[in-house]
Design a protein with these regions (language model features):
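Acidic, divalent-metal-binding catalytic cores of TOPRIM
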Residues: 1-337
Length: 337
């Protein structure tokens, strides 16, 4: 038994505390998340559902050591205690696409008090293609569109999609050690990226993927039917060839794909703005002052990307909001005769 009252928090305890506050007080719902970085995202999700009757408090289960297996720790903490007044908010990882083939996947999908991102992680939504131009503007204060992020990520996704299906296939079959997420990530890296060489980067990527797909086909000669069936099923779950990037490992997408591309784009946009200042300055003092002012006004890429909230129209995000709406507004049961 926990030594502190806070060690034994449950949905029922929060419900009792809510009732003690009186009928007119707003109902408090605790939302447990996995890490500090997740608090801002889930606050943006849940704040739209707050009203005169309820509010959310997003927090970590801080009494536990979250440095190892934090996701499993979170699930163990809340699986027995969650309810209408205490919910768990987690990254989907592969658990959504595994569709109950593991105990954790079953918990994530079927527990009505566990909410997940549908996309692999929050980072995937922060990298939502239609929002990335706005990120470059926030970083550089230059609204010149010099790179088509949506087309690039569409081509990237279409290139990696066949191999992604193989990745899920191995996890569904329980043989993921033969082709791990790390193995997949090594294949789908784009290497040293340049704006001028973007097309060549995609072509090299396709070649690497095709080679690995052929290898996996040889290693699994009887998998064709189950592979094609899984491919169709994944489409019904939202994984289309053009949106695959939303479902790969979030840290890999963020750190190794999107940030390097954003750096190339933002560097060029900054130079473009600085060249404009140099051309238009009337005298050297004005030039120095304008360059200094502009330099102090620009922002770092990673913090801006982590605070990007331009994913509100992304399909996974819309599905997440629908889940929360249903939780807060359960359908009324028709009386039985």
């Amino acid at each position: 038994m926990g030594k502190r009252l806070s060690d034994n928090l449950s949905s029922a305890y929060i419900d009792a505390a809510n009732r003690l506050n009186g009928k007119r007080a707003r109902r408090k719902i605790i939302a447990y998340v996995e890490a500090y970085d997740d608090i801002f995202f889930w606050r943006t999700v849940l704040s739209g559902f707050e009203n005169e009757e309820r509010y959310f408090e997003v927090m970590l289960p801080s009494r536990l050591n979250l440095t190892k297996g934090k996701r499993s720790v979170l699930m163990n903490l809340v699986s027995q205690n969650i309810g209408e007044n205490m919910i768990a908010c987690v990254d989907a990882d592969y658990d959504y696409l595994l569709q109950e083939t593991t105990p954790l996947s079953d918990e994530v999908i079927n527990n009505p008090y566990v909410f997940h991102t549908y996309a692999y992680a929050i980072e995937n939504l922060q990298c939502y293609a239609p929002s990335l131009h706005d990120v470059t503007v926030a970083v550089t204060l230059n609204d010149h569109s010099i790179f088509n992020f949506e087309e690039f990520l569409k081509l990237y996704s279409e290139s990696i999609h066949p191999l992604f299906v193989w990745s899920i296939w191995h996890y569904r079959q329980g043989i993921h050690r033969r082709f791990t997420i790390s193995d997949f990530n090594r294949v789908v890296e784009i290497g040293n990226f340049s704006l001028q060489g973007a097309t060549e980067s995609i072509q090299r990527l396709r070649h690497k993927v095709q080679m690995r797909v052929r290898q996996l086909q040889k290693e699994n000669p009887n998998a064709k039917d189950s592979y094609l069936k899984l491919k169709d099923e994944l489409r019904t779950l939202g994984v289309t060839p053009s949106t695959t990037y939303l479902y790969i490992q979030g840290h890999h997408l963020f750190d190794n794909i999107i940030v390097p591309v954003l750096k190339r784009v933002c560097d060029l946009l900054v130079r473009e703005r600085e060249d404009e200042i140099n051309r238009n300055a009337v005298h050297d003092t004005q030039r120095r002052n304008e360059l200094s002012s502009y330099g102090h006004s620009t922002e770092a890429i990673i913090p801006m990307l982590r605070r990007n909230v331009g994913y509100t129209n992304a399909e996974p995000f819309l599905r997440l909001k629908e889940d929360i709406y249903t939780f807060l507004n359960p359908p009324t049961q028709q009386p039985t005769d």
